């Protein structure tokens, strides 16, 4: 259904100051900041629970130049953060948006802490592709560590209404071309069995809502939209697995493009290299493979028994290397670490994978090699070589940064191993915004009045590929900024 102009006599079912489409990081942050100004907020979530992908992601969050870094003696800068992101994004990122994140990230962290989010104290994660440790580790081990306290805080506010099973259908455009409201369906039920839920699902009752200050797009990406993602990249076949929740489709994005929102880099899709082929979707093993094996341990090709990449490189580099090894015969690489590494990470990262059986535990490296059918002799020599690199601090094979291993290698039994493979994780492209989170028109090249966006539905922040933990700060920060923009209208 195309966007339409309501007749002068048209009556809305309801009127709010702000309508937010989506209930993840960007949506929650926007709602909180706008509600603080006394604005009346309506948040629409099409699924039966709030949070979207934000609730199931890893949850750790990058923040350059933060107080913990300074206390730990870690030197960082806005310029270094932007350079790291641009390197992994192949130089097609929008520097002004990255600069905005760097300038406001400490405000964002303060906001979520004030809302009850808890981080591991006095600790910074050293994520792949980053030059220095700059990421806070969320205590909960997943994005639920934000969504639960933020949702609880919003539920206590009388001027915030959150509706689940509420499917956005379209924008209502005023006579001046501004977005002045939306149509949505109440009582909608998502149906994962349909080829395209956005096109085929007609459940629910249509309602119209006036948005006096504007509409915020916080609907996330389209990693589960089989048709749209393959349209952008024909190599991504329908059976390609994704880490995302089933509702991650392009419905809201395509409606925004339909009213003139400028598209940015829609064909760039990111794979997450930390996934397990035996699990559906995100699974429970990602944090273990990432923080135990790739941050501190090693990954080997089972046929050769040898390493084949810098395990601390950016996600695109690692995913490309993994796909090359996997080939056509499902030769899934094996990620390995030891007991000392396991004891150094968040206990929740290993508990569930062990219980689910995706991570295997062995008394000796020989047993690990036998179980995973790794070239044993070559593997044992490769472990010795890797341990030597850790000792000297120099990776002569792949130039991995080892100084933050702080002596942790693969030498203390028991040993742990897990298969790994990439899955579609993040759709890099989306609508164009400016640093004020205003959506830009591809017709006028100016902001579309009344339309804002933040999070994965936005393109350009990360370029061709994003660094881990930057999506969280991106969504929270631009959600916060959009909320501030709405709040300023209340004055």
Language-model features: locations:
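Extreme N-terminal leader/targeting segments of oxidoreductases
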Residues: 1-18, 36, 459-461
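Conserved N-terminal/central alpha/beta ligand/cofactor-binding core
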Residues: 2-10, 40, 46-170, 178, ...
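C-terminal structured subdomain/cap of oxidoreductase catalytic cores
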Residues: 12-13, 32-33, 208, 346, ...
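N-terminal Rossmann-like FAD-binding beta1-loop-alpha1 element of flavoenzymes
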Residues: 18-43
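Residue-level detector of alpha-helix initiation sites
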Residues: 24-25, 48-49, 383
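Glycine-rich loop(s) and the adjacent beta-strand/alpha-helix scaffold that form part
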Residues: 189-279, 478-481, 485
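An anion/pyrophosphate-binding glycine-rich loop and adjacent beta-alpha core
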Residues: 253-255, 262-374
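A glycine-rich dinucleotide-binding beta-alpha-beta segment and adjacent secondary-structure elements
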Residues: 378-465
